[in-house]
């Protein structure tokens, strides 16, 4: 039987050595990106399910998948952060909100999330009509909705519209309000929802303070599809859904804190006023703070880092962004628990073009990781992740995890509404936090790039764009995880720690790619093709 050590001994035989070590590859000093190299295959003697992706993103914060969603206002709010944590990663809530309390509220939604619970269900109000329910069904696919006094979560629950109330109600093709939608009971689009709904006194209810097991038992005993969750005042707090409860069995890798709540991060800028924001999100239960700045080596970053470590020493802090070892040393010396690496490498970032400052992401990750890892500080590679293979490459260069923006934009869980773009393509808006759109939305985005709100001339370091619909993260994230596992299996490593050790020891070999090699490695020589990834 062939043993892995037999294969490794062949690799160490100079006459049979292919490629070069990572240190040899990076010794040429030219700026390398992820696309400039490949990793050579190793020996496989284990299954893909045996590959562990557990990693640390700070000294004390561990996650089960090396995936972090970027704190951008078109990428991460509570919906994205919840999904990221369910699949073993972590989401970082962006800071481009009108008020600090709004960001804290998003953190709370993540921390209060319970398996099967919908914390922000679409509600109808007392003044809603049958037409409004039909629109919710058409737009979101929901077959029922709670009815509250003013149509919001937190308002008094007065009833529930279920699929049974709408089973025989249909719209005409045009969806005109004057067209009858039922031949029975004289129900029309203008029929008040209060006439159709099941009133609250006829509903089975759960209480917000009940243990999840108790509410789930009530749902099962009464064979309910949905169970409204209320507080002592009868105000709607959440909706427990049978379909979502069944999905809960599919998250064995979920990232939890010591209290059994999902992990969640938040981004804060370097302005002095942001100390109030820090206090609010920490109060909400945030697990890690990211100090959000395009250039992390500044007096402003150091001041914010010191404030957080002095006022909230239990909270982990990822500082950045940095791309050099000198920058890394500065922030580690000031108490950073993790570092965020990248400057100008994101798909919507134009910093390198406009400011003439930045660094190729592959080289930045390698150089900073070599120094930071010696000091026990994990790094998160931020930017330049185009596909699943780039995640594996970032890890090979020393990253503990990758941060994704464009890769997650236009998923169902990303903030914003879909719309139809040119050619009938379903798209969502995606913008860099250094774009004029983001800066005009709120001042906190300007602070990331050291731009004052009063400045009449603003220099954009990002663009606004649209991204094609990627579908739900419930399909996309598992694809990314399994893709990384397959890549590591091909390399012959069982874990990220094993990967890092074999890279450092020169067992894992690399090869730089010529321009033609890059073309050859992609789809080519075809008349037409369809690229379906998952």
From Swiss-Prot:
IMP binds at residues 347, 382-384, 405-406, 430-434, 461. GO terms for biological process: GMP biosynthetic process; GTP biosynthetic process. Keywords: CBS domain, Cytoplasm, GMP biosynthesis, Metal-binding, NAD, Oxidoreductase, Potassium, Purine biosynthesis, Repeat. SUPFAM superfamilies: Inosine monophosphate dehydrogenase (IMPDH) (SSF51412). Its EC number is 1.1.1.205. It comes from the Eukaryota. It catalyses: IMP + NAD(+) + H2O = XMP + NADH + H(+). Its cofactor is K(+). The keyword Ribonucleoprotein does not apply. NCBIfam families: IMP_dehydrog. This is Inosine-5'-monophosphate dehydrogenase.
């Amino acid at each position: 039987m062939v043993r892995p050590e037999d294969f490794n001994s062949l690799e160490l035989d100079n006459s049979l050595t292919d490629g070069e070590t990572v240190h040899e590859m990076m010794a040429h000093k030219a700026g390398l990106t992820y696309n400039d190299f490949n990793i050579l295959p190793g020996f496989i003697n284990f299954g893909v399910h045996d590959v562990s992706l557990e990693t640390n993103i700070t000294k004390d914060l561990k996650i089960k998948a090396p995936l972090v969603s970027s704190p951008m206002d078109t990428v991460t709010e509570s919906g994205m952060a919840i999904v990221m944590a369910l699949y073993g990663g972590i989401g970082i809530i962006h800071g481009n909100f009108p008020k600090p309390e709004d960001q804290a509220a998003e953190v709370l939604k993540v921390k209060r999330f319970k398996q099967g619970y919908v914390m922000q269900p679409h509600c109808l109000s007392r003044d809603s009509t049958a037409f409004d329910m039909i629109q919710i069904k058409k737009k979101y696919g929901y077959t029922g909705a709670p009815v509250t006094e003013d149509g919001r979560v937190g308002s008094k629950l007065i009833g529930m519209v279920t699929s049974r109330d709408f089973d025989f109600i249909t719209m005409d093709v045009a969806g005109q309000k004057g067209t009858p939608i039922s031949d029975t009971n004289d129900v029309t689009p203008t029929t008040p929802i209060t006439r159709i709904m099941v009133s609250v006194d006829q509903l089975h209810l759960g209480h917000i303070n009940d243990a999840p097991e108790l509410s789930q038992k009530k749902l099962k005993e009464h064979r309910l599809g949905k169970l409204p969750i209320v507080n002592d005042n009868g105000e709607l707090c959440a909706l427990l859904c049978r379909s979502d409860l069944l999905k809960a069995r599919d998250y064995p890798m979920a990232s939890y804190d010591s209290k059994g709540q999902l992990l969640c991060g938040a981004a804060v800028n370097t302005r002095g006023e942001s100390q109030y924001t820090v206090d609010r999100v920490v109060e909400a239960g945030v697990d890690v703070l990211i100090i959000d700045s395009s250039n992390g080596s500044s007096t402003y970053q150091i001041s914010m880092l010191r404030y957080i470590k002095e006022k909230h020493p239990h909270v982990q802090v990822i500082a950045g962004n940095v791309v050099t070892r000198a920058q890394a040393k500065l922030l580690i010396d000031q108490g950073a628990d993790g570092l965020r690496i990248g400057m100008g490498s994101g798909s919507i970032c134009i910093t390198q073009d406009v400011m003439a400052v930045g660094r190729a992401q592959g080289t930045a990750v390698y150089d900073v990781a070599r120094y930071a890892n010696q000091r026990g500080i994990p790094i998160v590679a931020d930017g330049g992740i185009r596909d699943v293979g780039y995640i594996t490459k970032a890890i090979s260069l020393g990253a503990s995890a990758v941060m994704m923006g464009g890769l997650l934009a236009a998923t169902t869980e990303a903030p914003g509404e879909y719309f139809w773009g040119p050619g009938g393509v379903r798209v969502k808006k995606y913008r860099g936090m250094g774009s004029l759109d983001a800066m005009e939305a709120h001042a906190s985005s300007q602070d990331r790039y050291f731009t004052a709100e009063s400045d009449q001339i603003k220099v954009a370091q990002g663009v606004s764009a649209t991204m094609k619909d990627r579908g739900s993260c419930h399909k996309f994230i598992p694809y990314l995880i399994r893709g990384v596992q397959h890549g590591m299996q091909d390399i012959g490593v069982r874990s990220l720690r094993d990967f890092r050790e074999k890279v450092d020891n020169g067992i894992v070999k690399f090869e730089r790619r010529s321009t033609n090699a890059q073309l050859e490695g992609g789809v080519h020589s075809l008349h037409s093709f369809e690229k379906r990834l998952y």
